[in-house]
Curated annotation (Swiss-Prot):
CDD domains: WD40. WD repeats lie at residues 36-75, 87-126, 148-187, 190-229, 251-294, 297-358, 362-403. This is Protein hir1. It comes from Emericella nidulans (strain FGSC A4 / ATCC 38163 / CBS 112.46 / NRRL 194 / M139) (Aspergillus nidulans). The gene is hir1. Pfam families: Beta-prop_CAF1B_HIR1, Hira, HIRA_B. It is found in: Nucleus.
Length: 1031
């Protein structure tokens, strides 16, 4: 196979800034004459040192050329082609050097990505048999073949630190590979059509992909460690933004959509965009991911864009033009080259609204790829007619290239540079760094004071730039901050006077008790005073020096009510569940055949036959002894009281085939829901006495008819009357033809659930908001919170509706997974499942379920599954389980000392996890499981191999709390649990977990601390700078 290399010199004169620009274009035609046809050249790239040009073509070869020989084409003795590799079985569409220069990657239509590396040994083989090519000069060998695509690989991209390689293809997949081990880290299937381009952020925080679904998608990522696996990167590579506006009517005929990121990290040049009816290149701004700049001029779709890797200055750079801060006085500009289906090349600079170079008809077919040399002086292009072009610019044609340090300086504002040195990207990150440094300095002073014997050294934290004493910590558990009061000036338990400062430390009662025990005096026979020794730690290897699990042996008066001292973001069940919870019954698939006649039926038939011997039709009544003939009774006299319950509800036929059945409430004559002036549910006046009437604002009442039908037919019974009262004055009234079982409501709406499974919703003014919502069975639980309504049917289906948007956050979800239906599915008989002791909904529409076995669940609308937030295992195995003491059991809300406009944000999901854990403690103690579980834990601790059992379970418990609080958006709980978890893993020396906590799915420390700080309220954009770091 012969290669014909014929250089041809072209000169293009373009006027820019009142002077002439001369661009020398060397055109080299690569004709592959093996089959008397020229193969398309699809891709090219330049090595980081600028010495090699690599090309990929339709002949299945990856060819490496010497850039020195190309630019110095007048010297025919220099070898132009250094090596050629043929490891693909089809057309090669893309080829890219890694930024560290160590690897070369290629992708082809055989769905394979090949990785090459340069071997220092000379090549051991000559040119291919039957070819006229010169023997190879360099030895490039294939080290890996990456299999992960289902169709052609269209483009490749390396991160700036070479830590990852990303491949895109016609299978709509974006596959991320490790740049160290070349293992597949993640597959992103977010595009709906062919993906034809990828580019990386020079700040190493994002990468962008372009697809035929007419979108450019931005992904945020953190550079993985060299030993990272796919499991480690599950939360990495997150979709940040989807850009659609510039591509809404873009043509789908383009072979590539190769975009490029500017070297200063500010812009993305997206190919194949449109501006009205004409093709253009869209310039997308970083951060906002929008832009109103379009490069217009090409007559056909632009398929490839390439920013020059250097920043340029319009004027020559001199040392005396730099200011004292070592920044160039003149604003730098960037240069971008564009090409596509019109076979023309345009070069633009940011300081000029028009292109400075336009070269037309450079090839017979479309230009497929562009690549700049590292110094920005030469531009290479490939075309589908087999052409490889080299465009060389003289000094000053594009401007004057700045030093690479200017690139690094321009990237520091994004929080990092290519070397990964993280700095604060935003003012929030800077404030956190200052706070962290002040805290570290205070901690060092405290430790030095302790070493030097200074008893006044304390571990104060710094808030708002001022030292603020925090309460002492015990065993990694951070107590709630005490409110300043006069109690702080009273004497301490050991008799010493407290400091006179306005804010003092609240002593730990356990530490004070331990000090008193240590100082307990004893007297010998001769009257001498001695201090009795106290064993504060044992030598047993199975015992932990950390706090033991404190689980109460019995429920005492210290156990508080279900409502903690802080606001619990849950609905209040006043039309509540029965004592002991709502009974549930699970049916297995294996049912015994129903007998036509059993022994009991026989006895009944005998009694019926005996009663009908005289020819009368017997009337039977149900008695404890069974079915007995009815006995006449005296007629009632006087006024009869209205019964509380009229009858049991009629069971829906669908329950006969359901494997889950919940107890259906009885039909009551009078159902009431009352709220106070603040819109919170309260007890109605009839049951709470006169003292509560002043607090009741509105009462919603449903009255079911208790008397007989006026016509004698059951179908003609009286309708149900629903009335809304304010005081004694009715506001509105409505009637329903169906018996009402449950009612609920608040200031946003009122709702009633009927016996036939229908749910009605009214506005506060009495207007029916929607038509009747028909469920598959009777509702057994009906709750509301804000605009949300929760309805649970008798077959265990949970429905959540938003009355403001008339929508549901997720499809109906079954309670079977929560009630361990899988355990009982194969049972031959019905079995009792755990009872539902609490079913609530929070202000975000999340379902919260508490069971009689102590487990607590929340439904995740994003994962479409139940999440177990609390269980008895943590109560006896975790060292951080504490049911009655702050800060875990009775979490104090910090929002009462903050501004009122923060209350709503702070109350989201507040107190849910402590509420579920208190339920776990109570149910565990009531059912006597605590004693047996504690014995099991003690037995495990004494066995070999379980030395770290208690520590592992405690850390897992904190991780479960942390994940639950983050999922629920509970700010106060997340603040506490994150502090406890960070202290514990730091004390245990778990370096891997510490690194994951700090790096996680973000690029550096600021990317994980700033979102957490905003969630916790540490950083508040609305407050002043002095108050921005308030804890």
């Amino acid at each position: 196979m012969d290669i014909l290399y014929r250089p041809m010199l072209l000169s293009i004169y373009v006027c820019r800034a009142s002077r002439t620009v001369l661009a020398n274009i060397f055109v080299s035609f690569s004709g592959f004459l093996g089959e008397r046809k020229a193969f398309e050249v699809y891709s090219c790239d330049v090595s980081p040192d600028g010495s090699r040009l690599v090309t990929a073509a339709g002949d299945g070869y990856v060819r490496i050329w010497s850039t020195e020989a190309i630019c110095g084409a007048e010297d025919a003795n220099k070898p132009k082609q250094l090596a050629s590799m043929s490891n693909h079985s089809g057309t090669i569409h893309t080829v890219r050097f890694s930024p560290n220069g160590k690897y070369l990657a290629s992708g082809a239509d055989d769905k394979i990505v090949c990785i090459y590396t340069l071997d220092a040994n000379p090549p051991s083989h000559a040119a291919s048999f039957g070819s006229n090519e010169a023997p190879p000069v360099e030895n490039w060998r294939t080290i890996r073949r990456l299999i992960g695509h289902d169709n052609d690989v269209q483009d490749l991209g390396w991160s700036c630190d070479s830590s990852i390689l990303v491949s895109v293809g016609l299978d709509s997949k974006v596959v991320v590979w490790s740049g160290h081990t070349f293992e597949k880290l993640k597959t992103l299937s977010v595009h709906q059509s062919h993906v034809k381009g990828i580019t990386f952020d020079p700040a190493n925080k994002y990468f962008a992909t372009a697809s035929d679904d007419r979108t450019v998608r931005i992904f945020r990522f953190t550079s993985p460690a060299p030993n990272s696996t796919a499991h480690d990167q599950m939360n990495n590579f997150v979709l940040e933004q989807t850009i659609t506006a510039p591509f809404q009517n873009s043509p789908l005929t383009a072979y590539f959509r190769r975009c490029s990121w500017s070297p200063d990290g500010l812009h993305i040049a997206a190919a194949n965009a449109v501006n009205g009816p004409v093709s253009s290149v869209a310039i997308i701004n970083r951060g906002g991911w929008d832009g109103d700049i379009n490069l217009i001029g090409h007559e056909a779709p632009v398929e490839v864009c390439a920013f020059s890797p250097r920043l340029y200055s319009p004027q020559p750079i001199k040392k005396n033009q730099q200011d004292s801060h070592d920044h160039v006085a003149q604003a730098p500009v960037t240069v971008i080259a564009c090409a596509g289906g019109d076979k023309s090349l345009s070069v633009w600079i940011t300081s000029n609204p028009r292109p400075i170079v336009v070269a037309q008809e450079l090839a017979a077919k479309s230009i497929s790829d562009l690549a700049w040399s590292p110094d920005g002086s030469c531009l290479y292009a490939t075309a589908l007619d087999g052409t490889i072009l080299a465009v060389r610019f003289e000094d000053g044609d594009l401007g004057y290239a700045m030093e690479l340090e200017e690139n690094e300086k321009s990237l520091t504002k994004f929080g990092t540079n290519r070397k990964g040195a993280g700095i604060a990207e935003t003012t929030d990150g800077l404030l956190l760094e200052e706070k962290s440094k002040a805290g570290e300095l205070k901690g060092v002073e405290g430790r030095m004071g302790a070493l030097m014997g200074d008893g006044h050294a304390t571990g104060d934290a710094v808030a708002n730039g001022k030292p603020t004493p925090l309460p002492s910590t015990s065993n990694g558990v951070t107590p709630a901050a005490p409110s300043p009061s006069t109690d702080a000036q009273k004497s301490q338990p050991n008799g010493t006077a407290a400091p006179s400062a306005s804010e003092t430390e609240k002593p730990d009662p356990y530490q004070a008790k331990l000090e008193r025990l240590k100082q307990r005096p004893t007297y010998t026979k001769d009257g001498k005073k001695r201090i009795a020794p106290l064993l504060v730690s044992g030598a047993g290897g199975a015992e932990s020096s950390l706090p033991q699990a404190r689980l109460m042996a019995s429920v005492s008066s210290q156990v508080k009510a279900d409502t903690p001292q802080s606001i619990v973001d849950l609905s209040k069940p006043f039309d509540g569940l029965p004592k002991g919870g709502l009974a549930t019954l699970l049916f297995g698939n294996k049912r015994k055949l129903a007998q036509l006649e059993d022994e009991e039926d026989g006895h009944t038939e005998k009694r019926v036959a005996l009663a009908s011997q005289n020819g009368a039709t017997p009337i039977l009544t149900s008695a404890p002894e069974g079915l007995l003939p009815a006995q006449p009774q005296d007629p009632p006299t006087g006024q009869q009281p209205t019964p509380e319950f009229i009858r049991p509800a009629v069971v829906n036929p669908c329950m006969s085939v359901s494997q889950l059945r919940l107890a259906v409430p009885k039909v009551r004559t009078h159902i009431v829901r009352a709220i106070d002036s603040a819109g919170k549910p309260t007890e109605p006046p009839s049951t709470s006495g006169e003292s509560n009437k002043s607090r009741v604002d509105v009462v919603f009442e449903a009255r079911n008819p208790s008397g007989a039908s006026l016509t004698g037919r059951a179908a003609d019974r009286e309708p149900v009357r629903l009335t809304l009262f304010r005081g004694e004055q009715p506001l509105w009234q409505d009637f329903l033809p169906r018996t009402v079982l449950l009612v609920t409501g608040n200031q946003n709406m009122w709702s009633a659930a009927c016996e036939d499974g229908s749910v009605y919703i009214w506005t506060p003014a009495g207007r029916r908001l929607v038509s009747a919502l028909v469920l598959e069975a009777q509702p057994v639980i009906l709750e509301c919170n804000g605009p949300w309504i929760l309805s649970i049917s008798a077959v265990g289906m949970c429905y959540v509706w938003n009355v403001e948007h008339l929508s549901s956050p997720h499809p109906p979800v079954s309670l079977q997974p929560v009630l361990d239906a899988a355990i009982h599915t194969l049972g031959a008989h019905p079995s009792a499942a755990p009872s539902i002791t609490n079913a609530r909904i929070n202000s975000e529409g999340r379902i919260i379920i508490a069971l009689s076995n102590g487990e607590g669940y929340a439904y995740s609308p994003s994962l479409y599954t139940w999440q177990r937030l609390s269980e008895a295992w943590w109560a006896v195995g975790s060292q951080y389980w504490n049911s009655t003491e702050a800060p875990v059991g009775n979490l104090q809300s910090a929002s009462n000392t903050q501004q009122k406009d923060k209350d709503a944000r702070a109350a989201v999901s507040a107190g849910i996890i402590p509420f579920l854990e208190r339920n776990t403690t109570n149910e565990t103690l009531l059912r006597g499981r605590a004693y047996f579980l504690q014995r099991l834990i003690k037995t495990l601790l004494s066995r070999e191999g379980y030395e770290s059992f208690e520590s592992s379970v405690s850390i897992a418990h904190l991780e479960n709390r942390l994940a639950g609080a983050l999922s629920l958006g509970a700010k106060e709980e997340f603040r506490l649990y994150l502090s406890m978890y960070a202290k514990r893993i730091g004390a245990e020396g778990l370096r891997g977990k510490v690194e994951e906590l700090l790096k996680g799915k973000h690029r550096d420390l600021q990317r994980v601390t700033v979102p957490y700080a905003k969630l916790l309220g540490v950083v508040d954009n609305e407050s002043d700078a002095n108050d921005a770091m308030e804890l």
